[in-house]
Amino acid sequence: MSETNTGTPVVTFEGSPYRLHQPFPPAGDQPEAIRQLVEGLDDGLSFQTLLGVTGSGKTYTMANVIARTGRPALVLAPNKTLAAQLYSEFKEFFPENSVEYFVSYYDYYQPEAYVPSRDLFIEKDSSINDHIEQMRLSATKSLIERRDVVIVATVSCIYGIGDRDEYHNMILTMRVGDKLDQRAIVKRLTDMQYERNEMDFHRGTFRVRGDIIDIFPAEHAEHAIRISLFDDEVEGMQFFDPLTGHLLHKALRFTVFPASHYVTPRATVLRAVEAIKDELRERIDFFTRNNKLVEAQRIEQRTRFDLEMLDQIGFCKGIENYSRHFSGRKAGESPPTLIDYLPPDALMFIDESHVSIGQVGGMYKGDRSRKENLVDYGFRLPSALDNRPLQFNEFEAHMRQTIFVSATPADYEQQHAGQVVEQVARPTGLIDPEVIVRPASTQVDDLLAEIGKRIAVGERVLVTTLTKRMSEDLTDFLADNGIKVRYLHSDIDTVERVEIIRDLRLGEFDVLVGINLLREGLDIPEVSLVAILDADKEGFLRSERSLIQTIGRAARHIHGTAILYADTVTQSMQRAIAETGRRREKQIAFNLEHGITPRGVSKKIKDIIDGVYDAGSAQTELKAAQQRAAYDAMDEKAVAREIKRLEKSMMECAKNLEFEKAAAARDDLFRLRERVFGAAQHDLDGDGTK
């Protein structure tokens, strides 16, 4: 064991490339859970289940299992918010190893579709998040280059990406002293879908200046590489900052990875073009025989345009619809996915498996029904049906040794688990929330009173309702009563959702209202009360699993309480309350046995993914939170002095034309006045939100 500069112990294991930064040794049920899981893997168990309650340190247990086995790992999460949270935590545990993030790179995605009843064709439209695309490329690069890799992904990883072998064959490796013609390098870069751009040098581009070629690798976010040639020989290579041009350090060898997962060698493109032509002829014959002349003309026109593009530049819009021809697969064969990039001995962790497994099963059919219309009406060739996510049985066939992770395992995990490892006792000694049942007839007034108690002591509240309308009405009611409240709903995108959760932790507002978004894995230690309205309405949102998950959101606070508003106690409520009670008793017994006094969880408030979510705004929010704490500690005279200082600073900055500094001083002044006088001094969005 060694230590970092910050004093964090670093643990290594024999034969493992991982260096686990271990701020604290395993405690509670963790040591036994880690031992059993590693033993199960060594014994060759295909499936295991880690039944871990909220706040028991499941992620830390997973990190320990990965470090001890020394194998690459894929961690599946049910949504981007949870994936981002896991990525952030694994980065802290393995800062010296490769921790990667692989989620859908679409900020917006409108798939290609045809509505026969209205004769309406909807073109594919999408907006790609450049930074997430870079992280996806970095993930596949790491899997090819090294073994100490942890990939955190959503279930979008079961959608087809480029063939691993074709991708690997396109890699360009250069060493100092290699004989390489400048034109050959430029051609290889173009084949890898790098764009030559002398003016705007950004990720996935290159520029040529005499004997110097600058390449901005597609999988890098910050560094580019300069290749210096002399007489068709690589004379030197240096990393540099693409923004400032500052040279960083020399390199003796560098590997350029393709700018897209869908790159293919020229020979493969030509082979695919011939296969597409054959399929097109068959399809035209089919439509003609069935007297569908419009469809025959449509498929010919659309496909010939794509063929021309493929022949000339090796790429076309919607190239993924021809993926079967590029990979040489037969009709109906499973597409290549991220899982194919994993080595055979990799580990798979399926986090919140009771949700994730269901998602995997549901992906294929929705995709299939949309594409069948496109094929039937001549917008796409039948091979487009093979550009699809994995079917559930195919996913099962691709699964490596797998550990399901959930506080509420579903039927699939229970049927397939070789062993179930319980992790119920928390190292912090925190006890599961106290569950209180109160009548639904007075739920809103009672909730308002309970919220007031929590706000008075600086704690946060989550409220879950059954319908969108009720969430909106409740949010308006609470806001009218002076409560700082926000509403989390399905229309809010991933980035904004993460920011809302961060703002709740920072104290920008005190109450978060939602429907089905306040469940799995949301890590908010400041929340002391979870209120479940209409808890006696049986259904998906009020099932035993849903109730246990929602109650668990208050399990990270020392005063955690869950209030279920119901006029009758349903069977789901009974089972959820009984299971929570069982876990409370086990934790209390553990605390007594080991002399543990429960202590709250303290967790740094920070941006979840640097670069994906604006780090600048995160720093601003952190500074604001620190200022609020300082303002709270001031007496009246100190507050008056601080207000005068800020007013003077604001006026001086404005006089010197330093408008950004003046605006920052103005915002600090508004915050201080709001804190002291209890009223908002300005309204940025017109609705009281900032």
UniProtKB/Swiss-Prot annotation:
Motif segment (Beta-hairpin): 105-128
UniProt KW Cytoplasm keyword: yes
Stored Gene3D superfamilies: 6.10.140.240, P-loop containing nucleotide triphosphate hydrolases (3.40.50.300), UVR domain (4.10.860.10)
Predominant location: cytoplasm
Tagged with keyword Disulfide bond: no
Locations listed in the record: Cytoplasm
Biological process terms in GO annotation: nucleotide-excision repair; SOS response
Domain Helicase ATP-binding: 39-422
Protein family per UniProt: Belongs to the UvrB family.
Assembly description: Forms a heterotetramer with UvrA during the search for lesions. Interacts with UvrC in an incision complex.
UniProt protein name: UvrABC system protein B
Gene that this polypeptide is encoded by: uvrB
